[in-house]
């Protein structure tokens, strides 16, 4: 049996045992922090920076890569963390399909949902190079990759590495 330890999230005392990172502790406590790149079954990557939290005495940390420690005092939605997340979203949208905010998926897209939640109505940093779309890569029988919609979270690369679908046959 693993000993229970305690930390504090927004002033609430939260017990944890063997969770690998702060994000898992936060989720098990029934709280939410946005994230794009985190997948519980893959190695933590910390690429998207949406899961930032403020840790007293340590500043801003990505909750998916920081291990929990007894006594930590964590703040989820401070003005600073919300501002950082909004900037991350604005930068992701700058390199994203220009029709994202009016996309047909309307509501079924995490990027669109977070843009709405953080009050992003227009693309603040338009990328002039994205006037022409990159071709869709449908060469794989398993994955169709549209680079115009990719947010560089790394989840597909890590999933393929773990599942060994990145290995090639003798003919390729």
Identify what each model region corresponds to:
Residues 25, 91, 156-159, 163:
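Generic, well-ordered alpha-helical scaffold segments in large soluble proteins
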Residues 143, 147-159:
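Internal active-site segments that recognize and position negatively charged phosphoryl groups
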Residues 135, 141-144:
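Histidine-acidic residue clusters that define the catalytic metal-binding segment
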Residues 165-172:
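Conserved small/polar residues in nucleotide/adenosyl-binding loops
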Residues 1-135:
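Signature of N-terminal electron-transfer/Fe-S-associated modules in redox systems
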């Amino acid at each position: 049996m693993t000993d229970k330890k305690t930390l504090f999230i927004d002033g609430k005392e939260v017990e944890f045992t063997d969770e690998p990172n702060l994000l898992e502790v936060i989720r098990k406590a029934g709280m939410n922090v946005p994230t794009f790149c985190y997948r519980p079954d893959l190695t933590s990557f910390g690429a998207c920076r949406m899961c930032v939290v403020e840790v007293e005495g340590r500043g801003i940390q990505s909750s998916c890569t920081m291990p929990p420690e007894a006594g930590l005092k964590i703040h989820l939605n401070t003005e600073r963390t919300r501002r950082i997340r909004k900037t991350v979203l604005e930068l992701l949208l700058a390199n994203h399909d220009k029709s994202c905010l009016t996309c047909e998926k309307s509501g079924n897209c995490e990027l669109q949902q977070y843009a709405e939640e953080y009050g992003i109505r227009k693309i603040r940093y338009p990328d002039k190079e994205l006037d022409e779309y990159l071709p869709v890569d449908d060469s794989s029988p398993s994955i169709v990759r549209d680079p115009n919609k990719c947010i560089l979270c790394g989840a597909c690369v890590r999933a393929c590495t773990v599942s060994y679908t990145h290995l090639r046959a003798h003919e390729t």
